[in-house]
Design a protein with these regions (language model features):
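Acidic catalytic loop of the alpha/beta-hydrolase fold
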Residues: 232-236
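Flexible "cap/lid" loop of the alpha/beta hydrolase fold
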Residues: 117-122, 126-162
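Active-site loop/oxyanion-hole signature of alpha/beta-hydrolase fold enzymes
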Residues: 64-107, 125
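Gly/Ala-rich beta-loop-alpha elbow adjacent to hydrolase catalytic centers
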Residues: 108, 112, 116
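Short beta-strand/loop motif that positions the catalytic acidic residue
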Residues: 221, 227-229
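Conserved HGGG/HGGXW glycine-rich cap/lid loop of the alpha/beta-hydrolase fold
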Residues: 18, 23-74
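Catalytic active-site module of serine/aspartate enzymes centered on a nucleophile-bearing elbow/loop
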Residues: 250-286
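Conserved alpha/beta-hydrolase catalytic His-Asp/Glu region
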Residues: 143, 154-219
Length: 286
């Protein structure tokens, strides 16, 4: 768990009667940046963003929630809708509770990046989004075969270490990252929340769901988007950022030479890239 600093504090509040943990910091009147964590086993706001948030909070108002089912938030999920939909609604309900009504900049890694893109694809939320930055989060498509390697988890630290090796480049903070991620993975309810949507349904009860139109709803959306693709990432198909850039007229694609989570292993370099994009986007919007 992230140790509280003078810049970043940890809070838990009720949102729609569901415990919701989030990290926050920076000036109260700063431009709001919402950081969205990855969806791997043991994912949480501090696991994904602990080294980036203090850098961002020097200038921006930062808010980093734990998604439902993850971290210190309620282990409450919906299995009748997509894994994105109910978490997007919960995220904006949290912002409402915090009095954040102006458009926010969404910054996500992996599943968190996909949440940002899926929110942008939804006309109900598009007006509340000033920009989206996604680091190796595609919104769902373009998965590579290695994605299957991080799905199974037997509850052991050794298995989580194998998953972490796929997600992250080697770094001095690897043991601390493993400790934090394993701590959240062991919280009661997390395993069930992760496994629940994948439970087999008897043939007699199976209902064919409508085809997913994504990414077509993003076609022509002019909101600024930063697509960060990593050349060492084996979980996604190479070139996914160019494919999305072809759909989004105001998207910028950048490459980094790392694995799936450079925000964890190379926080300063990652933040410099994101911060530069945010500065240009904010200045361009004035």
């Amino acid at each position: 768990m992230l140790t509280e600093t003078s810049l970043i504090t940890e809070e838990t509040i009720l949102v729609a009667n569901l415990e919701t943990r989030y990290l926050a910091g920076g000036p109260d009147d700063g431009v709001p940046i919402v950081f969205l964590h990855d969806g791997a086993w043991g994912g949480a706001s501090d696991v994904t963003w602990s080294h980036v948030l203090p850098l961002a909070a020097e200038k921006f108002r930062v808010i980093a929630p734990d998604f439902l089912g993850y971290g210190g938030s309620a282990k409450s999920i919906r299995v009748d809708v997509s894994p994105f939909a109910f978490r997007i609604r919960h995220m904006f309900s949290l912002l409402d509770s915090l009095g954040v009504t102006e458009p926010v900049h969404l910054v996500g890694n992996s599943f968190g990046g996909s949440i940002g893109l899926r929110a942008l694809a939804d006309e109900a939320y598009r007006g509340r989004i000033a920009s989206v930055t996604t680091i190796n989060g595609t919104g769902g498509p373009w998965k590579a075969p290695d994605m299957a390697k991080i799905g199974d988890f037997d509850g052991t630290r050794a298995r989580l270490e194998e998953i972490l090796d796929i997600l992250c480049d080697p770094s001095d903070g690897q043991e601390a990252q493993l400790d934090a991620r394993f701590g959240w993975a062991a919280v009661p309810g997390h395993f069930t929340a992760m496994r629940g949507p994948h439970m087999p349904v008897p043939a007699a009860l199976r209902v064919e769901r409508p085809a997913d139109p994504y990414p077509a709803p993003l076609q022509g959306v002019a909101t600024p988007v930063l697509l960060v693709e990593c050349t060492g990432d084996t979980l996604l198909e190479s070139g996914w950022s160019k494919a999305l850039q072809a759909v989004l007229p105001n998207a910028q694609a950048e490459l980094l030479p790392y694995k799936h989570c450079p925000n964890i292993t190379h926080p300063r370099e990652t933040w410099d890239l994101i911060g530069g994009f945010l500065d240009s986007t904010i200045q361009g919007g004035k």
